Amino acid sequence: MRVLITSKAGAGHLGPLLPFAHALRRARADVLIAAPAEAATMVRAQRLPLWAFDDPPPGERDAIFAEVGRLPPELSGPSVVGDVFARIDARAAYPGILAACRAWKPDIVMSETTEFAGPLVAEALGLPAVTIAIVQIGKGAAMMQSAKVRSALEDLRAEFGLDPDPDFERARALPCLTVLPEALEDPALAQPQSVMRFREVPDVTRGALWDWWLGDERPLVYITFGSAAPKTDLFPGVYRAAIDAVSAMSVRALVTIGRDRDPAELGPVSSNVRVEQWVPQHDVMPHAAAMVCHGGSGTVTMGLAAGVPMAVLPLFADQPWNAERVAELGAGIALAGEPDPGGIRDAVSRLLTEPAFRGGARRVAAQMRALPPVDAAVGVVRDLLEDVLAA
């Protein structure tokens, strides 16, 4: 079985796909990742083969991303998905994914839900396709109905010679796999029957990370705002606010800022704060007493799976949805407004001293442990292929 997995660059996009890629590899399937060239470092670190397609023209996305940090959440999501993902990125990706399919001849195409070119290429070539959800499925489906996103996708279909699909019937009919828990979904929104949820079984390592604080028993606070925020006008302000919040607290704080930034850009930090570009989150979560984050779906899912209570400061995209659900689940605190050291400090203090928050996170962790392991998804993919061949 040959499986082409398509993705955008960035940990928030690639990360939720990797459990499925590794599960397929363990089952001796041939797997090829098709992603922008800028994803090469992350893909190769996973020892997965990469078909690199062209990044969008330099600077084409910069103005939009710079503006996103200044937009209210209800506008930032459709702007990113419609203007960037469904127009700029998908237009750049389509030729490369098409070339990968023609040269490598996969049996099936699997695409994360914000990588729109992969399913369109599969449709054009008559290949079966599967989506891998990286955001809340109900809320994501609702966003797809925004005028900005609908227009972008219909323009894309017309550009590549595909029939119109104004109601997204083809997209909704695709099987959808995910490691995101149902607890993150808005209970007021119906879930498609095609959704199948699994639990990730992380390969946790131990390394120099813990040598930084040998003998220090103070609780560990993990601070991360994802891989996109460092590329926007939110850097360095939001990071500095979080660092200032914990500097005088009796905690250890690990801050990650992404591979595109230098820790020196944040200026001096107190001795209880460690700033790194990148640390595998699976290595951090088992030791974290609390987390301060942006509310990215991957980060929130990993934190909940480990039972880590969190303070969520949503910045853009799907993050306000996740902040709201974390608070509703009793697994953390949703922060609103501009980044404020005092507000972050108060939230962290509550997470560390009020057991109810850890209890809420652990309840979700128990629900996630009851899901089938991600290796079970291999059987789903094989059954889909058999159904296609039998049709």
Each language-model region and where it sits:
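A donor-sugar binding/catalytic signature common to diverse glycosyltransferases
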Residues: E276-R325
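N-terminal subdomain of nucleotide-sugar transferases
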Residues: M1-W51
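Donor-nucleotide binding loops and adjacent catalytic segments primarily
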Residues: P192-Q193, R197-A290
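A short, active-site helix/loop in glycosyltransferases that binds the activated sugar's phosphate group
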Residues: R157-Q193
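C-terminal amphipathic helix plus adjacent low-complexity
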Residues: G343-A391
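Phosphate/nucleotide-donor binding subsite
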Residues: P49-W104
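Conserved nucleotide-sugar donor-interacting segment of glycosyltransferase catalytic cores
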Residues: G82-F160, P164
